Amino acid sequence: MNTPRIIVAMSGGVDSSVAAWRLNSQREAIAGLFMRNWTDDGNGQCHAEEDRRDAVAVCGILGIAFHFRDFSHEYWQEVFTHFLAEYANGRTPNPDVLCNREIKFKHFLETARELGADRIATGHYARIEHYRQRWHLLRGADRSKDQSYFLHQLGQEQLAATLFPIGDLEKQQLRQLAHQTGLPTHAKKDSTGICFIGERNFREFLKQYLPAQPGEIRDPQEQRIAEHPGVFYFTLGQRQGLNIGGVRNRPPSPWYVIGKDLATNVLYVDQHRDSPFLQSRWLRSEPAHWVSGSPPAHTFTCTAQTRYRQADEPCKVTVRNDGSLDVDFTRTQWAVTPGQSLVLYDGNECLGGAVIATTDAPLERKRARNLSKTENVLQ
């Protein structure tokens, strides 16, 4: 068998199946590789073995070689430990961004080269174009499925060695193609959420690694409302899981998380989704990553997303001396959350992004002041 020039990341889902089929139909020399990034705990929550069987079946139908690699150790060291540390520090991380940077476009790419390939392909909904002497990361044609948000940490070296064969397709088109070509994954449900959590209750999963520290739930006026099982388990804007029943002299309206103070172990809530405590017009990020290798300018305007699938928000970006960003939004933003990703766009092009460090929301300023006083519970 000839040495493959392209290794396709086979997840066992319909997206990677069609990606492999399209390349194969173009007579590219390809092979498939299934990555195991998490060691199953025996509860079958990740469906990893089922996904592996589906990947094997698709490779068999296409007549291409199948490879398997276990990256669970790398995932634990480079993604999961960071995930836990962020929650322990009161932030809400985005492990998919790290997984792409550290696993799929680092270890997987290295493995593909060891197998003799010079490029990799994945089933991401994004596009890559080369013009003006550099590679550009663009949104996928299907905006409802676009995954450039999770790919903003990629750089020129990775883009030069990567193909996104389904980036020009709508999801409905893709499923039709899969059905017409007889791929066994054509009707398979899309995976959602974080694989290592699967279908389990998020709080129960996190308790295995971060011990519960119950404390008070208070309103903005410091009035005690109820008790919480641990501030780690909640994020800004969260409504579900608070277990706040009827509160005396309060209307029967839903409660929303508006902040958390690790120093006092207090979770703050309010009954208004548009609470001023959830509003911000400014944020500061950690040092940014730029797809091109450098920012467009010291100060520039663009659009931003502070969460996946958020509508584009106009903003002004100032690059600080340490590489971090000050971002001023044209409109007030809701529940901008430290630890999440700020991703910047110029039209359909993803410029890059950074982890959100802090905002000008009232309780977030308090959290930032107290964070340095709090010991890391993982130590």
Curated annotation (Swiss-Prot):
Residues covered by region (Interaction with tRNA): 145-147, 307-308
Keywords: ATP-binding, Cytoplasm, Disulfide bond, Nucleotide-binding, RNA-binding, Transferase, tRNA processing, tRNA-binding
E.C. number(s) listed in UniProt: 2.8.1.13
Chain residues that bind ATP: 9-16, 35, 123
Top EC class for this record: transferase
Protein name as it appears in the record: tRNA-specific 2-thiouridylase MnmA
Family according to the record: Belongs to the MnmA/TRMU family.
Protein function: Catalyzes the 2-thiolation of uridine at the wobble position (U34) of tRNA, leading to the formation of s(2)U34.
Site, as annotated: Interaction with tRNA: 124, 340
